[in-house]
Amino acid sequence: MPIFTAQELAERFNLQLFGDGNIRIHGVATLTQASPEQLSFLANPRYLTQLPNSRAGVIVLHADDVKAASGAVLIAKDPYVTFAKIATLFDIKPAREAGIHPLATVDPSAHVSPTAHVGAFVSIGARSSIGASCIIGTGSIIGDDCTIDDGSELIARVTLISRVRLGKRVRIHPGAVLGGEGFGLAMESGHWIKIPQLGGVVIGDDCEIGANSCIDRGALDDTVLEEDVHIDNLVQIAHNCRIGAHTAIAGCTGIAGSAKIGRYCLLGGHVGVVGHLQICDNVVITGKSVVRNSIHTPGEYSSGTPLTDNRTWRKNAVRFKQLDMLVRRMMAVSKEKA
């Protein structure tokens, strides 16, 4: 495990240090759990009361909170971002040896870089390509005509069905499925006819896709995630969607076919997005919201019913059904008074 002094961290990240610069930091932890050999941070004012009693050797915080701390501190404009950067110094991953495991299966027409790691029980299909320094974890399946660019990682049991292109430094967690058939059906004489899904999936550089998430291939055009998109666990992105660069989508969100989401958007957990609509750049959708219409103005949007006690909720549920009747009565009274 690496060790850094407080002074070394201050110099490395251009931070102002107050206190003992010789304190040696072995790791990171929360304010309540950190030991004198660990670094912590304060980014949310609601945790300010934890600051005086924290045993952390060094705390990253905003200049306004210095007086509440008792030990060494590092001053940061954005303590959360600074903590994230420092934490990466302690996130040491074991090195993977380059080469193809004897229990992997690689089609003769596929290309695997000699610097890539291909784990046990991996299957790589025809005409697929694995770039330099890629890691293809145990049990992953890469179908035909897939391309994985340099430095990308499929952690384990990831499935790329066909016609999937990953950019550089893409990271995909276990159970994710990319390139599955989109949900395309046409009704004829009381029976569904399956519409062939002839497009692919394109994932930009520096994207991350969480465990058990699914991204369907397009019907005609590709389904596209632009660069630096981050997808949480259990997210469904349907065929022909386009997700703009630097957008983040939290768990259990579902995005229906052909929806277009802009750049720098944030979608909270369990959001539903109706198909064939557009969301502009810099939009925040709070958790449990349902987006039924296009959004053309940046900002924060919400829907759904906030949590309340059951007794109040039941009363409000009954009154909600009465809203139309009450509005009509009010309009009638207004007309009579007029």
Curated annotation (Swiss-Prot):
GO terms for biological process: lipid A biosynthetic process. GO terms for molecular function: N-acyltransferase activity. Its EC number is 2.3.1.191. GO terms for cellular component: membrane. InterPro entries: Hexapep, LpxD, Trimer_LpxA-like_sf, UDP_GlcNAc_AcTrfase_non-rep. Pathway: Bacterial outer membrane biogenesis; LPS lipid A biosynthesis. It comes from the Bacteria. Keywords: Acyltransferase, Lipid A biosynthesis, Lipid biosynthesis, Lipid metabolism, Repeat, Transferase. Pfam families: Hexapep (PF00132), Hexapep_2 (PF14602), LpxD (PF04613). The active site is at residue 239. Gene3D superfamilies: 1.20.5.170, Hexapeptide repeat proteins (2.160.10.10), MurE/MurF, N-terminal domain (3.40.1390.10). Homotrimer. This is UDP-3-O-acylglucosamine N-acyltransferase. It comes from Xylella fastidiosa (strain Temecula1 / ATCC 700964). The gene is lpxD.
